[in-house]
Amino acid sequence: MASFAQWISGARPRTLPNAVAPVVAGTGTAAWLHSAVWWKALLALVVAVALVIGVNYANDYSDGIRGTDDHRAGPMRLVGSRLAFPRSVLTAAVVGLTVSTVAGLALALLSAPWLIMVGATCIAGAWLYTGSSKPYGYKGFGEVAVFVFFGLVAVLGTEYTQALRVDWVGLVLAVSTGALSSSVLVANNLRDIHTDTQSHKFTLAVRLGDAHTRQLYQALLVATGVLTVVLMVATSWCAVGLVATPLALRAMRPVRSGRMGPDLTPVLRDTGLAMVVWAIAVAGALTLAGSVTY
């Protein structure tokens, strides 16, 4: 059976930047509006991290029982590798999604109860990604969902729970974060394009083809750089976000050079690192430019 280390690996900790970056970005925007509330930021982080972990275990379970993980080029999968019983992985997914739900309910009730409906949509989206009879992740809509849930909803939701409003800076940050989060999934699906095709998993990469998927990945990173310049209208300090440029360029290199399969795995790590560095830098700039409410 799976060891503790394998269970941790099954949670796919390298995807956690998708949870951390939007909360950092949203809190930075709240600070810009003189309304940062750090305990709410921590609660939002619990929501996001638990959601990502729950999604990862849910994907492991759903893909594993379908057999689509049997020949994956990426990280070890618990069900696909026969290291854990499907029911055990499903239980782990339910625990993660439950923790996210409870923390989200608390955050919504203490901020704006109507956000409960938004949270319910996020939980449903997390499960239906691969868990339904017709998973939308198999239809090419995964990147769109990531853009919405880990970009628009996560950033603007974090901002709203603290400031009780959103502004154009938050919207630009949300679009930027969504683009970066989506680029991680684009890179993941580019790596798995051949095995996904064989498994009849029609991800966006499979639908676009290899060349266009590589172009999309690069376009998403470039778009974030352009939007960082736009943020300099709010405060020139946001230029510090460009410190992530070398990391983004390093992530692009294997994509531009035509690497395939497992050789693209480092792209996911480097893209996630670039996303976190960018979010911390821009949020820090906005925090310093505004006054923080403790």
UniProtKB/Swiss-Prot annotation:
Tell me the GO BP annotations in alphabetical order: menaquinone biosynthetic process; vitamin K biosynthetic process
Enzyme class label: transferase
Cellular compartment(s): Cell membrane
Cellular component terms, GO, for this chain's entry?
plasma membrane
Which pathway does it take part in? Answer: Quinol/quinone metabolism; menaquinone biosynthesis; menaquinol from 1,4-dihydroxy-2-naphthoate: step 1/2
Membrane-spanning segments: 35-55, 103-123, 140-160, 166-186, 220-240, 272-292
Task: Provide the E.C. number(s) assigned to this enzyme.
Answer: 2.5.1.74
GO molecular function terms listed in the Swiss-Prot or TrEMBL record: 1,4-dihydroxy-2-naphthoate polyprenyltransferase activity
Which InterPro entries does its entry note?
A: MenA (IPR004657), UbiA_prenyltransferase (IPR000537), UBIAD1 (IPR026046)
* Entry keyword annotation includes Transmembrane helix: yes
Q: Main localisation, per the record?
A: membrane
**Keyword terms, alphabetized:** Cell membrane, Membrane, Menaquinone biosynthesis, Transferase, Transmembrane, Transmembrane helix
Question: What's this protein's family per the entry?
Answer: Belongs to the MenA family. Type 1 subfamily.
- PANTHER family noted in UniProt: 1,4-DIHYDROXY-2-NAPHTHOATE OCTAPRENYLTRANSFERASE (PTHR13929), UBIA PRENYLTRANSFERASE DOMAIN-CONTAINING PROTEIN 1 (PTHR13929:SF0)
- Listed name of the protein: 1,4-dihydroxy-2-naphthoate octaprenyltransferase
Q: Which organism is it from?
A: Mycobacterium leprae (strain TN)
State the organism's lineage. Bacteria, Bacillati, Actinomycetota, Actinomycetes, Mycobacteriales
Q: Which gene encodes it?
A: menA
